[in-house]
């Protein structure tokens, strides 16, 4: 018997179909590479920005200072957020440097574990927001890992400035039972860290006068916003 050649319409001949496929794949690859080059060449336009919250033992990340500060960070383009959580139940920390140091060591180990998978070099801008003993944890973590970040320290402890936090701004109340305001202020000056002091405010930057405390919170957040908006050093 004689074989008859199968006639394909030009658009669907096997060879033509293969050519179309190659052209489409090539076009997709070229487009993808172009997008990657565009994003790579515009890192200043589309920077990777990360904010990390280091809470205190009893002051979690949804309490006012950390809640509103990270909201401000999100408005400033920090679209990657990490919220740390601690587990610590021992009492008797206040007034006991040894107990406080033990708590710090425990919380620092927990922070190390929670941040172990972070690829720090991929971020163009890193901001640490911290509260109370979390200010010492954040300062130690940045120092030990050489992370070029900025830090906002809410109600820091004396221990915090022994860890030399860099590129930082601090807030403290003069009636804070966890910190001696004068010694912390001196340590902040020696470290080159601006410290905003609030008269008669406690460890939560509150006085008991609700309207006054709301005004204080607004002032703290305005200063926080200004610091966040500054170009990273």
Give, region by region, the residue ranges found by the protein language model.
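Gly/Ala-rich beta-loop-alpha elbow adjacent to hydrolase catalytic centers
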Residues: 129-138
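Serine-hydrolase catalytic machinery in alpha/beta-hydrolase-like enzymes
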Residues: 48-122
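Short beta-strand/loop motif that positions the catalytic acidic residue
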Residues: 170-172, 176
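A conserved short beta-strand
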Residues: 147-156
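Catalytic histidine-centered segment of alpha/beta-hydrolase-like enzymes
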Residues: 201-215
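Conserved alpha/beta-hydrolase "acid-adjacent" motif
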Residues: 177-183
């Amino acid at each position: 018997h004689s074989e008859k050649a199968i006639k394909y319409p030009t658009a669907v001949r096997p060879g033509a179909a293969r050519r179309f496929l190659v052209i489409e794949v090539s076009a997709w690859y070229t487009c993808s590479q172009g997008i990657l080059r565009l994003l790579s060449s515009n890192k200043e336009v589309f920077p990777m920005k990360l904010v990390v919250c280091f809470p205190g033992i009893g002051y979690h990340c949804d309490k006012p200072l950390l809640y509103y500060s990270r909201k401000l960070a999100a408005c400033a383009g920090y679209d990657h957020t990490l919220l740390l959580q601690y587990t610590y139940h021992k009492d008797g920390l206040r007034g006991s440097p040894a107990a406080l140091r033990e708590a710090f060591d425990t919380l620092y180990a927990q922070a190390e574990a929670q941040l172990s998978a972070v690829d720090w070099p991929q971020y163009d801008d890193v901001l640490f927001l911290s509260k109370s003993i979390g200010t010492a944890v954040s300062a130690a973590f940045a120092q030990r890992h050489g992370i070029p970040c900025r830090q906002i320290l809410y109600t820091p402890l004396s221990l915090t400035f022994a860890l030399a936090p860099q590129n930082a701004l601090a807030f403290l109340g003069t009636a804070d039972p966890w910190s001696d305001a004068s010694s912390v202020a001196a340590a902040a000056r020696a470290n080159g860290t601006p410290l905003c002091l609030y008269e008669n405010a406690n460890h939560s930057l509150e006085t008991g006068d609700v309207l006054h405390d709301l005004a204080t919170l607004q002032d703290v957040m305005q200063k926080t916003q200004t610091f966040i908006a500054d170009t990273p050093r």
